[in-house]
Amino acid sequence: MSFLSKLSQIRKSTTASKAQVQDPLPKKNDEEYSLLPKNYIRDEDPAVKRLKELRRQELLKNGALAKKSGVKRKRGTSSGSEKKKIERNDDDEGGLGIRFKRSIGASHAPLKPVVRKKPEPIKKMSFEELMKQAENNEKQPPKVKSSEPVTKERPHFNKPGFKSSKRPQKKASPGATLRGVSSGGNSIKSSDSPKPVKLNLPTNGFAQPNRRLKEKLESRKQKSRYQDDYDEEDNDMDDFIEDDEDEGYHSKSKHSNGPGYDRDEIWAMFNRGKKRSEYDYDELEDDDMEANEMEILEEEEMARKMARLEDKREEAWLKKHEEEKRRRKKGIR
């Protein structure tokens, strides 16, 4: 026998054994388990008979009425089923259809359902309809809004324990009332005549000097003008009149008309022999700590010169140092 034939025999033997094991259980008959005898007849109670007859009569009466109200019941059931479907849909949507809101004061009041209105669906329009609508909108004149802002009075709350702030009420002046009356009469004229358009032109964006500097320059100009006029008048009288304001005149009259001491010498004693004239300066002639282009260039040139000099000094020192090393080496050899 071949190997395949042996396998087929083994399979057949296993299926037959399984069929023998899985035998159906015998069905249980109700008659075998009944304790009463087969020929037993149960006697009915007269009260039970009466109740059965009354029940049968009621059923007959209700049957005649049921035929008439059958159509109405069908209609009612259809409407009730629709309501149930709507409620189920609302529950499925997550309760978006009906929401309950509670008022502030009524904590124990029953909840009132607030129906939320669904937005209307947007109508789909073709391209031609949209173009027509745009043309109609162009033909219609634009609505001009009033430029005067509407001022709303803010609500004022009176709190207990706080002083009531008295706000000054603006009284209409008689001039304003007259203007209002006159403007009412001339409103037609103003509407006809177009108002001139005012353009905000850009101002000159160039840099301007500081305010203090400007004032100093103007004061200098004024002083120079007065001084020039005064010098012209004095030039005619210089030949035969000695000026009292001249420095030479003051130096001559120091010892004669002065207080008996020289202030410049005293000032030099306390300032290490320096003259007082070296420190005389005008406040207006003082620098403003602002360097010009020429000053910057001069400083750069000076810095370059100093750097070159330092480089030359370093090179000379290095050369000397190397020469000294060579001499020492030669002397050792």
Swiss-Prot record:
Residue ranges the record marks as coiled coil: 218-242, 292-316
First-listed, main subcellular location of the protein, grouped into a coarse class: nucleus
Segments of skewed composition (Acidic residues): 229-247
The entry's keywords: Acetylation, Activator, Coiled coil, DNA-binding, Nucleus, Phosphoprotein, Repressor, Transcription, Transcription regulation
Low complexity bias spans: 180-193
Domain remark in the UniProt entry: The acidic C-terminal domain mediates interaction with histone H3/H4 complexes.
Name of the protein in its database record: Protein SPT2
Annotated organism of origin: Saccharomyces cerevisiae (strain ATCC 204508 / S288c)
Gene (UniProt): SPT2
